[in-house]
Amino acid sequence: MAKIQIKSEKLTPFGGIFSIMEQFDALLAQTIDSTLGLRCTMFGYQYSEILRSLMCVYLCGGSCIEDVTTHLMKHLSLHPTLRTCSADTILRAIEELTCKNITYKSASGNSYDFNTADKMNCLLIKALLANGQLKSGQEYDFDFDHQFIETEKHDAKPTYKKFLGYSPGVAVINDMIVGIENRDGNTNVRFNQRETLERIFKRLEASEVYISRARMDCGSCSEEIVDMVEAHCRHFYIRANRCSSFYDSMFALTGWKTVEINGIEFELNSILVEKWKGKPYRLVIQRQRRIDGDLDIWEGEYTYRCILTNDYKSSARDIVEFYNLRGGKERIFDDMNNGFGWNRLPKSFMAQNTVFLLMTALIRNFYKAIMQRLKTHEFGLRATSRIKTFVFKFISVPAKWIKTSRRHVLNIYSDNYAYANLFKTDFG
């Protein structure tokens, strides 16, 4: 057996987190406190410190808020100037930032709760502008979808996926979440979606962030939603619902063009359709021959998919390929569930958990900003690396704070000299 010596020096295995804490403070602290307001004037923690403490949980490999007190406090508190708060303080802050649910009644008389969390949604956009991830006056591509979060909280409702939970509507630009509005899990995806999207668009436009192209699934294919989306973007691309009138038009079509997309052979065509009275749009039709050879009662030997759009210039192939990129956004939800705590919601009610969803969305957006600034190849990382890889290859490095010549210095115990460029701040 190897000889063991015990050293009582204050070393931490999370040496990489300190530079991230400093960058969070430099980039976002002022934006957070000016948007949410000062939480205290003398003693206590500001909201920027609370969000930074929550960020450290997930960027150090934690899975729930309590990890900051149970496992990380003794390491994070080694920083000479930046304070870390307890899990109880984070949970109290979530309650303080909670806004009341809005209850809507459907035509059938059923009631559904929504939570808009306006202030936190505004902060989400302002933080992206402060990071430089969004720029005022520019146009972006926009995606919207509903994510079903499985949970057995007090007010969780049964979803169509056969589990209890919530179904928040999530708006995404590029790889960044720009808006979240939570809803009861049993709410139909189209119910009040127009109002949700309109609020998200108006928040973006208030910050002079504009939408060039919007992509959505068939849950957004209704007249009132399409009218509203068209008013806030140049072009929209929405998966169209199939109906008997569409089949009559599709079966009579000629001039199908055979193309290969991602190694799969499809046939493409497009027509003008009047899906709603007096409103003609372009319908891009994609069909694929059934592999099993069986005939469908409606579609025959093909499987049909349609995209409704007001883009009359792009080719059918370009439109299909652009719409297919929407599938990559599912990675964001997977990332939030497994890396940023969406699968372990901390509170018992939807209104409070909505604040948590937005807090962690802000943290993930900040993580993406860090990956853009970091010379990832020097740490064996890529810009698309997941949080677990980031923890192993960047955060997990032995370190020790010392004070010499009236200055605080962080000693990093690593043969990777790239860390030297990250710790050049004088803490006096």
Name each model-derived stretch.
Residues Q147-I149, M176, R183-G185, C243, ...:
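Short, glycine-/Ser/Thr-/acidic-enriched flexible segments
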Residues S53-L54, V68, S86-I90, Y140-F148, ...:
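Short, conserved catalytic/metal-binding motifs centered on acidic residues
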